Regions:
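Topogenic membrane-insertion module of multi-pass membrane proteins
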Residues: 1-53
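Alpha-helical transmembrane segments of polytopic integral membrane proteins
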Residues: 22-25, 47, 85, 116-119, ...
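Transmembrane alpha-helical segments that form the membrane-embedded catalytic/substrate-channel core
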Residues: 52, 115-127, 187-195
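Multi-pass membrane catalytic core of lipid/isoprenoid biosynthesis enzymes
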Residues: 12-13, 61-122
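Hydrophobic alpha-helical transmembrane segments of polytopic
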Residues: 13-16, 41-48, 110-113, 117, ...
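C-terminal membrane-associated helical module and adjoining short loops/tails
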Residues: 1-2, 134-195
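Interhelical loop and helix-boundary elements at the membrane-water interface
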Residues: 1-18, 59-78, 123-144
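Membrane-interfacial alpha-helical segments at the cytosolic side of multi-pass membrane proteins
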Residues: 22-29, 82-92, 148-155
């Protein structure tokens, strides 16, 4: 395999993660006009999580880890797993809570928790070289938090799924939590960002 192509594979995967994060931001902006874009943005972030899992593994397996790769990975993580979940929370609540009940400043502040705390976590991870090399995480990794936020939003927005499981006790329990208590998703997202 050509050495240039070999060295490009992990970075291409990481840049694909970044591209999907950017595409999710665009879709979330468009979701103000069409609901289905919210679900599509969530699915793209779930794919980004898979890409984030394999890019580092491939780099280590091919023995081509680089400082550039580590830095671009953190940037992609910031976009896909910090900015997108915060924007996702904000847009979700703009859509489900009547505008006369929305306190935009409070909503912006609370929705920013995944972004701010995720950025702090990524900066700490990059600053502590020995922690990065041991591959131990402190707290909940940003991709896991993004999966949690996307899963909750998908549950609320995925009507076809609800048609098949409406009678199950599990669905009734989750719908009580997430549909009847609209602020529960934001509360869970904030707590998981703090972890």
């Amino acid at each position: 395999m050509n050495i240039l192509i070999k060295k490009s594979i992990p970075n291409f995967i990481t840049l694909s993660n970044l591209f999907l994060g950017f595409t999710s931001i665009i879709l979330l902006s468009l979701s103000l006009y069409k609901d289905s874009y919210i679900s599509t943005a969530c699915y793209l972030i779930l794919i980004s999580c898979g890409l984030d899992t394999i890019d580092g593994k491939i780099a280590r397996k091919l023995n081509i880890s680089s400082e550039f790769g580590k830095e671009i990975d953190s940037l992609a993580d910031l976009v896909s797993f910090c900015i997108v979940p915060s924007l996702l929370l904000f847009i979700h609540y703009i859509k489900v809570i009547p505008s006369e009940e929305n306190n935009f400043i409070l909503l912006i502040l609370l929705s920013s928790f995944p972004l701010i705390l995720g950025a702090i976590r990524l900066a700490k991870y990059n600053a502590l070289r020995e922690m990065r090399e041991s591959q131990k995480y402190l707290g909940l990794p940003t991709p896991a938090n993004a999966i949690l936020v996307c899963s909750m939003i998908l549950f609320v927005h995925n009507i076809p799924f609800r048609m098949f499981v409406n009678d199950s006790i599990f669905y009734q329990f989750l719908s009580t939590i997430f549909l009847d208590y609209q602020w529960m998703i934001l509360n869970v997202a904030i707590v998981s960002s703090i972890l």
